[in-house]
């Protein structure tokens, strides 16, 4: 199901993450999107982003994300959300993360909005 409004991307991402739907999570990213999971680390394109999300989904955790803002200019939108994640590693250790994300989304020719840039945790978030 295509996301036809940028302010619905966060909600759709949360729903898909909750059921570990990797294929439809990937559909929320442009083919040449950039995901920057840590300072100085950039993952480019579906193959690299898929590998990262696959590892995160293995933690079998719960993601809670609240959208803070969605600023739109034409076919581009800047999204900001506050999120927390709690899961377990393969060894059973508790994994807890959280922060404030910033994402740039773009509307495609098909009318669907997708992430072009995903910064899960801003430096001061």
Each model region followed by its residue ranges:
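Short, cysteine-centered beta-strand-loop-beta hairpins and adjacent loop/turn segments enriched
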Residues: 86-95
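A short hydrophobic beta-strand element
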Residues: 74-85
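Short beta-strand segments enriched in hydrophobic/aromatic residues
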Residues: 29, 83-85, 119-121
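Generic hydrophobic alpha-helical segments
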Residues: 12-13
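Short beta-strand edge/turn micro-motifs at domain boundaries
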Residues: 98-125
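A solvent-exposed, acidic/Ser-Thr-rich amphipathic alpha-helical stretch
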Residues: 3-9, 22-74, 96
């Amino acid at each position: 199901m295509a996301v036809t409004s940028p302010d619905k991307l966060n909600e759709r991402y949360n729903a898909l993450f909750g059921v570990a739907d990797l294929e439809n999570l990937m559909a929320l990213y442009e083919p040449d999107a950039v995901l920057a999971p840590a300072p100085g680390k950039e993952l480019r394109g579906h193959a690299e982003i898929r590998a990262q999300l696959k590892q995160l989904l293995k933690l079998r955790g719960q993601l809670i994300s609240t959208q803070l803002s969605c600023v739109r200019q034409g076919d581009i939108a800047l999204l900001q959300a506050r999120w927390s994640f709690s899961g377990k590693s393969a060894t059973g250790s508790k994994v807890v993360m959280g922060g404030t994300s910033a994402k740039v989304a773009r509307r495609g020719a098909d009318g669907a909005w997708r992430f072009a840039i995903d910064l899960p945790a801003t430096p001061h978030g």
